[in-house]
Amino acid sequence: MSQSFLSRLPLSRFELDRDHLGRERPALFDELWANPATRILLIFQGSALLATPDSLALLPVDAVPHFSERVYLGTSTSTTSPEPAGTPIVAVELDDAGHLAESDWANLRQVGSRLSDRDAGLLTEALGILNWHTSHRFSPRTGEPTVSEKGGWVRRDPVSGGEVFPRTDPAIIVGVTDADDRILLGSNALWESNRYSLLAGFVEPGESLESAVMREVHEESGLRVVDPVYLGSQPWPFPASLMVGFTARVEDGFTGAATPDGAEILDRGAQVADASGV
C-alpha cells in the first residue's frame, strides 16, 4: 500500500493524538473547560462551523453556547495549524445554531477533500463518534437512558452497569477489472441517473473481507471474481462505516455478462477502457 494511494483518501488523513489515557480521568471535562488552551469544534445537524472555506473554526470554551453532547477528540499534533501542537480539542453537538448563518457551516462531503490533514481527521472523528451517541442513547439490555462517560467514548447503563462502546461497520469497495482491463461500475438504485461508482457493500457476520468482495460483486453484478487485493481504508462516518478498498479481477474463463441485481444496482457500465490509472 503506497503513501501516494493513501494521500488520495481524504478522510484517512489525521494529525491528532487521541489521548486514550486522558479519557480515563474522572474530572476530564472540568479540566478541559478550565484550560484556556482548549478549543471546541462545533457540530450542528452533521455540519461543522468553518473559519474559512477550507478550514474548521475552533473556538475557546467561553464562546460555546449550550450543547447536547460533547466528546474529547484528543490533542493536535499539527505543526502547521494556527493552534499549537498539544492543543486539546473537544467536539460539541449543538441543539440549535443560534445566530450563526447557514453559510457558516459545511458537511464532510462538501469540504473533506479541501481540509488540512488535521481538520479532516478532526471532523471525521467527531461525526463518527457523535453519530454513535445519537444511536445509543438507550441501553440495549434494559431500555434505560445511558450516560456518557470517559470523555464521551463510553456509554453506561445506570441500572445494569453495563458499558456500551463505539462500533464501526466494515464495508468493502472494489475495483473489478476484466481481461481487457475494463473496470466495472454500477449505478445505485437511490442515485440520480448517469451516476456510477465502484461496487461496494457491508461485510456480513462471520465473513472475511475477501469473501465479502467476492460475494458482493456476484450478488450485485452476477460476475465471479478472484484475487481480491487490499489497497487501503477510509473511515466513512455516514453514519459509522469503514470503507476497505480492494481490487479484484473477473475469474478466467467466466463468460457471463455483468447483470445488475435490479434491487441495489439498476445499471452497470464498463466504459472505462483503461483502468490502469484508476
PLM regions and their residue ranges:
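Cys/His-rich short segments
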Residues: 125-175
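A gly/proline- and charged-residue-enriched helix-loop-helix capping module
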Residues: 97-141
